């Protein structure tokens, strides 16, 4: 899994799935319904990610943290962190062997946005999307 920078304010879901699928951001965006609109407006939900991955034959399932419990988060898992002062809309990150792939590690700077790896999640996990 390689670094993929999100190319729009709400494009973290696209960047994480692109990295997981070894596709470019633009290639992956085509697998999201209304991706070019949602990346600029309200972003994506778990079902959008699951459907996009399904479109490229990757099976996934979403869990809330209450249901997930203390289970270990495996490589290739996408996590949504809850809204916070820093991430006012929440944020998706991808678990990799290099740590958490953050598609906008230099938030809030958008010009240019940069992706990077970090050792810990920058917030509290709210949702987990696991590859089946």
Regions found by a protein language model. Name each.
Residues 1, 131-132:
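Short intrinsically disordered terminal tails
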Residues 1-38:
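Active-site-adjacent structural segments surrounding the nucleophilic cysteine of cysteine proteases
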Residues 32-124, 130-131:
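Conserved active-site-adjacent core of cysteine acyl-enzyme catalytic domains
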């Amino acid at each position: 899994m390689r670094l993929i920078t999100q190319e729009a304010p709400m494009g973290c879901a696209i960047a994480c799935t692109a990295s997981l699928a070894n596709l470019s951001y633009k290639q992956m965006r085509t697998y999201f319904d209304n991706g070019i609109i949602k990346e600029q407006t309200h972003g994506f939900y778990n079902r959008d990610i699951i459907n996009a991955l399904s479109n490229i034959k990757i099976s996934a399932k979403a869990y809330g943290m209450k249901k997930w419990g203390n289970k270990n988060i495996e490589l290739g898992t996408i996590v949504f962190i809850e809204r916070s002062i820093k991430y006012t809309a929440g944020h998706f990150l991808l678990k990799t062997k290099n740590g958490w792939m953050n598609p906008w590690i230099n938030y809030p700077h958008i010009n240019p946005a940069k992706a990077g790896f970090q050792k810990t999640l920058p917030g509290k996990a709210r949702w987990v999307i696991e590859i089946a």
